[in-house]
Regions:
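NAD(P)H-binding glycine-rich loop region in Rossmannoid oxidoreductase-like domains
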Residues: 1-24
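Conserved Rossmann-fold NAD(P)-dependent oxidoreductase catalytic core, especially the SDR/UDP-sugar
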Residues: 2, 30-72
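Mid/C-terminal beta-alpha module of Rossmann-like enzyme folds, strongest
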Residues: 148-215
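Substrate-positioning beta->alpha
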Residues: 108-114, 128-151, 157-161
Protein backbone atom coordinates (compact mmCIF):
# COMPACT_ATOMS: atom_id res chain seq x y z
CA UNK A 1 0.00 0.00 0.00
CA UNK A 2 1.50 3.31 -1.13
CA UNK A 3 0.37 6.28 0.99
CA UNK A 4 3.23 8.76 0.62
CA UNK A 5 2.71 11.98 -1.29
CA UNK A 6 2.92 15.75 -1.32
CA UNK A 7 -0.35 17.15 0.01
CA UNK A 8 -2.72 19.05 -2.25
CA UNK A 9 -2.18 22.81 -2.03
CA UNK A 10 -4.86 25.28 -3.08
CA UNK A 11 -4.37 28.54 -4.85
CA UNK A 12 -1.65 29.61 -7.23
CA UNK A 13 1.43 27.41 -7.10
CA UNK A 14 4.98 28.54 -7.69
CA UNK A 15 7.19 26.64 -10.12
CA UNK A 16 8.91 25.09 -7.10
CA UNK A 17 5.57 23.83 -5.75
CA UNK A 18 4.64 22.32 -9.11
CA UNK A 19 8.04 20.65 -9.34
CA UNK A 20 7.58 19.23 -5.85
CA UNK A 21 4.26 17.67 -6.86
CA UNK A 22 5.89 16.08 -9.90
CA UNK A 23 8.90 14.79 -7.97
CA UNK A 24 6.99 13.33 -5.03
CA UNK A 25 3.59 12.38 -6.41
CA UNK A 26 4.70 11.16 -9.83
CA UNK A 27 8.42 10.40 -10.03
CA UNK A 28 8.69 8.82 -6.58
CA UNK A 29 5.60 6.68 -7.21
CA UNK A 30 7.00 5.55 -10.55
CA UNK A 31 10.34 4.66 -8.96
CA UNK A 32 8.64 2.77 -6.13
CA UNK A 33 6.45 0.82 -8.56
CA UNK A 34 9.48 -0.14 -10.63
CA UNK A 35 11.39 -1.22 -7.52
CA UNK A 36 8.39 -3.24 -6.34
CA UNK A 37 8.16 -4.97 -9.70
CA UNK A 38 11.88 -5.77 -9.73
CA UNK A 39 11.58 -7.20 -6.21
CA UNK A 40 8.72 -9.48 -7.21
CA UNK A 41 5.99 -7.71 -5.24
CA UNK A 42 2.67 -9.32 -6.17
CA UNK A 43 0.23 -6.50 -5.32
CA UNK A 44 0.58 -2.72 -5.29
CA UNK A 45 -2.28 -0.40 -4.27
CA UNK A 46 -1.66 3.34 -4.57
CA UNK A 47 -3.76 6.12 -3.06
CA UNK A 48 -4.51 8.69 -5.75
CA UNK A 49 -7.11 11.47 -5.77
CA UNK A 50 -10.28 12.53 -7.55
CA UNK A 51 -8.15 15.50 -8.60
CA UNK A 52 -6.50 13.09 -11.09
CA UNK A 53 -9.57 13.88 -13.21
CA UNK A 54 -10.85 17.22 -14.48
CA UNK A 55 -13.38 19.12 -12.41
CA UNK A 56 -16.92 17.74 -12.93
CA UNK A 57 -18.71 21.02 -12.23
CA UNK A 58 -22.37 19.96 -11.82
CA UNK A 59 -21.98 16.54 -13.46
CA UNK A 60 -22.10 13.23 -11.60
CA UNK A 61 -19.06 11.40 -12.97
CA UNK A 62 -17.40 8.00 -12.82
CA UNK A 63 -13.89 6.72 -13.50
CA UNK A 64 -14.35 7.13 -17.27
CA UNK A 65 -14.71 10.92 -17.03
CA UNK A 66 -12.57 12.09 -20.01
CA UNK A 67 -11.67 15.60 -18.85
CA UNK A 68 -7.94 15.79 -17.94
CA UNK A 69 -6.76 17.29 -14.64
CA UNK A 70 -5.85 20.97 -14.60
CA UNK A 71 -3.76 21.43 -11.45
CA UNK A 72 -0.11 20.42 -11.01
CA UNK A 73 -1.24 18.14 -8.18
CA UNK A 74 -3.87 16.42 -10.31
CA UNK A 75 -1.55 16.07 -13.29
CA UNK A 76 1.12 14.46 -11.12
CA UNK A 77 -1.41 12.05 -9.61
CA UNK A 78 -2.70 11.07 -13.05
CA UNK A 79 0.84 10.54 -14.34
CA UNK A 80 1.53 8.33 -11.30
CA UNK A 81 -1.54 6.23 -12.11
CA UNK A 82 -0.30 5.75 -15.68
CA UNK A 83 3.19 4.83 -14.47
CA UNK A 84 1.76 2.31 -12.01
CA UNK A 85 -0.35 0.72 -14.73
CA UNK A 86 2.71 0.43 -16.98
CA UNK A 87 4.71 -1.22 -14.18
CA UNK A 88 1.88 -3.64 -13.56
CA UNK A 89 1.85 -4.68 -17.20
CA UNK A 90 5.64 -4.95 -17.35
CA UNK A 91 6.06 -7.12 -14.26
CA UNK A 92 2.73 -8.92 -14.13
CA UNK A 93 1.98 -7.11 -10.86
CA UNK A 94 -1.56 -6.60 -9.49
CA UNK A 95 -1.82 -2.79 -9.43
CA UNK A 96 -4.75 -0.56 -8.45
CA UNK A 97 -5.14 3.20 -7.96
CA UNK A 98 -7.80 4.55 -5.61
CA UNK A 99 -9.01 8.06 -6.39
CA UNK A 100 -10.02 9.41 -3.01
CA UNK A 101 -12.58 12.12 -2.42
CA UNK A 102 -12.08 14.34 0.64
CA UNK A 103 -11.15 11.95 3.46
CA UNK A 104 -12.28 12.56 7.03
CA UNK A 105 -12.00 10.71 10.31
CA UNK A 106 -10.32 10.67 13.71
CA UNK A 107 -6.97 12.45 13.72
CA UNK A 108 -7.59 14.25 10.43
CA UNK A 109 -6.08 17.69 9.82
CA UNK A 110 -7.87 18.72 6.64
CA UNK A 111 -10.45 21.35 5.75
CA UNK A 112 -13.38 19.48 7.29
CA UNK A 113 -11.57 19.07 10.60
CA UNK A 114 -10.75 22.78 10.69
CA UNK A 115 -14.37 23.60 9.92
CA UNK A 116 -15.52 21.23 12.67
CA UNK A 117 -13.24 22.90 15.21
CA UNK A 118 -14.66 26.34 14.40
CA UNK A 119 -18.26 25.08 14.46
CA UNK A 120 -17.73 23.48 17.86
CA UNK A 121 -16.37 26.78 19.21
CA UNK A 122 -19.38 28.62 17.80
CA UNK A 123 -17.36 30.94 15.58
CA UNK A 124 -18.09 29.45 12.14
CA UNK A 125 -20.69 31.52 10.24
CA UNK A 126 -23.98 29.82 9.32
CA UNK A 127 -23.64 29.30 5.58
CA UNK A 128 -26.43 29.96 3.10
CA UNK A 129 -27.82 26.94 1.25
CA UNK A 130 -26.52 27.10 -2.33
CA UNK A 131 -27.25 23.53 -3.41
CA UNK A 132 -23.58 22.74 -3.96
CA UNK A 133 -22.44 19.17 -3.43
CA UNK A 134 -19.22 17.71 -2.00
CA UNK A 135 -18.18 14.06 -2.06
CA UNK A 136 -16.39 12.61 0.95
CA UNK A 137 -15.04 9.30 2.23
CA UNK A 138 -14.52 8.15 5.81
CA UNK A 139 -11.06 6.78 6.56
CA UNK A 140 -12.57 3.41 7.57
CA UNK A 141 -14.19 3.11 4.15
CA UNK A 142 -10.89 3.97 2.48
CA UNK A 143 -9.16 1.16 4.38
CA UNK A 144 -11.95 -1.25 3.44
CA UNK A 145 -11.58 -0.28 -0.23
CA UNK A 146 -7.82 -0.80 -0.07
CA UNK A 147 -8.22 -4.30 1.32
CA UNK A 148 -10.94 -5.14 -1.19
CA UNK A 149 -9.04 -4.14 -4.33
CA UNK A 150 -5.83 -5.76 -3.09
CA UNK A 151 -7.58 -9.12 -2.72
CA UNK A 152 -9.84 -9.14 -5.79
CA UNK A 153 -8.18 -10.14 -9.07
CA UNK A 154 -10.89 -8.26 -11.01
CA UNK A 155 -9.50 -4.95 -9.72
CA UNK A 156 -6.07 -5.39 -11.31
CA UNK A 157 -5.09 -2.58 -13.66
CA UNK A 158 -8.03 -0.38 -12.65
CA UNK A 159 -8.59 3.00 -11.01
CA UNK A 160 -11.55 3.45 -8.67
CA UNK A 161 -13.20 6.51 -7.14
CA UNK A 162 -13.68 6.10 -3.39
CA UNK A 163 -16.55 8.24 -2.09
CA UNK A 164 -19.69 7.84 -0.03
CA UNK A 165 -22.82 7.77 -2.22
CA UNK A 166 -24.33 10.65 -0.25
CA UNK A 167 -23.08 14.16 -1.06
CA UNK A 168 -23.32 17.26 1.13
CA UNK A 169 -23.72 20.98 0.62
CA UNK A 170 -21.70 23.44 2.66
CA UNK A 171 -24.81 24.31 4.68
CA UNK A 172 -25.63 20.64 5.11
CA UNK A 173 -22.18 20.02 6.58
CA UNK A 174 -22.59 23.00 8.91
CA UNK A 175 -25.94 21.71 10.19
CA UNK A 176 -24.65 18.14 10.56
CA UNK A 177 -21.62 19.28 12.55
CA UNK A 178 -23.73 21.37 14.92
CA UNK A 179 -26.02 18.39 15.48
CA UNK A 180 -23.03 16.10 16.11
CA UNK A 181 -21.73 18.49 18.76
CA UNK A 182 -25.14 18.78 20.43
CA UNK A 183 -25.54 22.43 19.44
CA UNK A 184 -28.88 24.05 18.70
CA UNK A 185 -29.96 24.34 15.10
CA UNK A 186 -29.34 27.75 13.53
CA UNK A 187 -32.27 28.92 11.40
CA UNK A 188 -30.60 31.91 9.80
CA UNK A 189 -27.60 32.32 7.54
CA UNK A 190 -25.06 34.95 6.62
CA UNK A 191 -25.92 36.32 3.15
CA UNK A 192 -23.62 35.19 0.39
CA UNK A 193 -22.84 38.80 -0.51
CA UNK A 194 -21.52 39.46 3.00
CA UNK A 195 -19.35 36.35 2.88
CA UNK A 196 -18.05 37.36 -0.55
CA UNK A 197 -17.05 40.79 0.77
CA UNK A 198 -15.26 39.21 3.74
CA UNK A 199 -13.51 36.76 1.42
CA UNK A 200 -12.25 39.59 -0.77
CA UNK A 201 -10.96 41.32 2.35
CA UNK A 202 -9.16 38.07 3.13
CA UNK A 203 -7.65 38.10 -0.37
CA UNK A 204 -6.25 41.56 0.31
CA UNK A 205 -4.79 40.57 3.66
CA UNK A 206 -3.14 37.56 2.02
CA UNK A 207 -1.61 39.76 -0.67
CA UNK A 208 -0.12 42.05 1.97
CA UNK A 209 0.88 39.46 4.56
CA UNK A 210 1.96 36.71 2.18
CA UNK A 211 0.11 33.95 4.04
CA UNK A 212 -3.31 32.27 4.01
CA UNK A 213 -6.18 33.48 6.17
CA UNK A 214 -9.20 31.36 7.21
CA UNK A 215 -11.59 32.98 4.71
CA UNK A 216 -10.58 34.03 1.21
CA UNK A 217 -12.28 33.72 -2.17
CA UNK A 218 -10.93 30.25 -2.79
CA UNK A 219 -12.04 28.94 0.61
CA UNK A 220 -15.50 30.45 0.08
CA UNK A 221 -15.81 28.80 -3.32
CA UNK A 222 -15.05 25.43 -1.77
CA UNK A 223 -17.73 26.00 0.87
CA UNK A 224 -20.46 27.31 -1.40
CA UNK A 225 -19.60 26.56 -4.98
CA UNK A 226 -17.96 23.12 -5.24
Amino acid sequence: FHFAGHAHAFGALSEADALRHRQVNFEATRALAEAAGEAGVARFVSLSSVKAMGEPQDACIDEDWPVPPESAYGQAKRAAEDALLAAGERYGMHVVSLRLAMVYGAGGRGNLERMASLVRRGVFPPLPETGNRRSMAHVADVVAAMRLVAADARAAGRSYIVAHPQTHSGRGLYDALRAAFGLAQVRWSVPRGVLTALARLGDGIEALAGRRVPLDSEALDRLLGS
